[in-house]
Amino acid sequence: MAFNFNWSPLTADAGFYKRARDLLTTALNKSPKPPIIVDDIIVTEFNLGSVPPDLEILEIGDLAEDRFRGIFKMCYSGDAFLTLKTRVQANPLNTCLSAKPDFTSPQPLAAASSLTIPLQITLSEFKLSAFIILVFSKQKGLTIVFRNDPLESLKVSSTFDSIQFVRDYLQRTIEGKLRDLFMDELPAIIHRLSLQLWCPDQIAKEDEEPKEADEHGVNPLATPPLDAVDLHGHLLDPAAISELSLDGGPEAQLLFSQKTLLRLSDITNSQVTSSLDTSETKDVLFRAWAGPDKVDLTNTTPLATPSLARSYSYTSPHTYTFSDNGSQDQGSLPSRPSLVHLNSATAGLSLGSGRHSKAGRKKKTRVVNLRRKAETEANSEEEEDTPETDSIEPPMSEPIMPHPILEESDEELASNKVHFGRSPDLQQQPRRPSFRAQATNAPEVPVPSVELGKTAVPPLQSSEKQAARFPSQDPAFVDSKTGRPRPRSDTSSVILEQAWIMKMAGEIARRVYDEKNGNPTFWDDQDDTPPPAYEAR
């Protein structure tokens, strides 16, 4: 099968060359240019030459009167040439610094000044060899696809041919640029040129559509808003709006719609979102609202931590408190810890929270004289200071006020110093002496009492056991403080109190007496001699 391939009509048409130069100029300036080229690349001359390419048919896929599809092998080594014109940067230091960040450059002054030189490049002696897929249609034009890189070699002639390294640099750069041009841009250029030859009506449509798209613009002054306001929110006169123009100055930029401004303000006052229907969240501070003029809420002083108090709870219905009456008379709080919440006679002691009060105060030594005084002195003090409390019966829920313990003066303590040596007076005393009489400067507060009913008579056996265990509960018991018989109308709480006090006092005296008998010399004041290792020499 033979084909007649006429090359002369392409080389003789002047309009074809003009159209080809424009397409090549657009294609060369589309991709990023190297930093050395500082101006646009313009195609000044383009000629296909008189030698046509050699085509070899490898495969025919479709053949008809108006279409053709096949695979060809093309070889070209003709006299076609292409001339380009541009401007280049002759100072390599300026080119290097322009392609790097400012903070990494040494910032030279005169050495980095720009020096641009016009450059003219001529491309000739093209040698091409490629496999081409060619598709032709009268309605769609000619489409060519290169299956491999078609460029084998070419000759680059420029203004700097006398400078060897510039010529080599231009040769490498232009060859790489043309390889990309053949693979990407040349098929599109050939397709558009084929449309100009066989389908001129489609060329006119493609040229008109972009122009129409560019011409149609939006004029904001053609249809101004009905409630037009300026930047300050003042209404504008419609006659004044018609006099405005897009190029008239800043007045055209101050034309706003009042509704638009209201909606924009709603967006600003909402949750900083584009949705006007966002539900409002109370007591929330957004980061976008906090500017440099806002108060920094992160440095505010946190709220003071509430003071914590430890409380002790017991199930005992009675409370016994021993306080320092001498300190109360002086108008100060007692430094001795108080005894609170006694559960029963067999329960342990619980100290109050007064151990940290008056920490800087000097500690006083309390000495309790356990020896019994004369009954006459105790009786007179009891008759003068103790009120009658037998007839008063307060409710059980009433709290018991503390029973103060008198504090002896320093002179009395010096005269009545307790010695635990063996003496005839101490041998005549019983093993468990009773607690000393309680003398008070203030009247005693009545204690809760329970009236024993006439019908509520305890059984005989339990009363005998109780009398044997606590002799103080016997009706004929004589009080150690007053010497008078204690009536049966005393409450059980008073009996338990006296029993517990007697038990504790006797236990303390017994332990002291046992320690004294076990080690008689322990309580004597004597100076021990130091051990031999620490004797003075």
From Swiss-Prot:
InterPro entries given in the database record: Mdm34 (IPR027536), SMP_LBD (IPR031468)
Gene Ontology biological process terms in this record: mitochondrial genome maintenance; mitochondrion-endoplasmic reticulum membrane tethering; phospholipid transport
Any one cellular-component term (Gene Ontology): ERMES complex
Compositionally biased residues, Acidic residues: 378-391
Stretches with biased composition (Basic residues): 355-371
This protein's record includes keyword DNA repair: no
Protein's job: Component of the ERMES/MDM complex, which serves as a molecular tether to connect the endoplasmic reticulum (ER) and mitochondria. Components of this complex are involved in the control of mitochondrial shape and protein biogenesis, and function in nonvesicular lipid trafficking between the ER and mitochondria. MDM34 is required for the interaction of the ER-resident membrane protein MMM1 and the outer mitochondrial membrane-resident beta-barrel protein MDM10.
Family label: Belongs to the MDM34 family.
Name the record gives this protein: Mitochondrial distribution and morphology protein 34
Origin species: Chaetomium globosum (strain ATCC 6205 / CBS 148.51 / DSM 1962 / NBRC 6347 / NRRL 1970) (Soil fungus)
Gene: MDM34
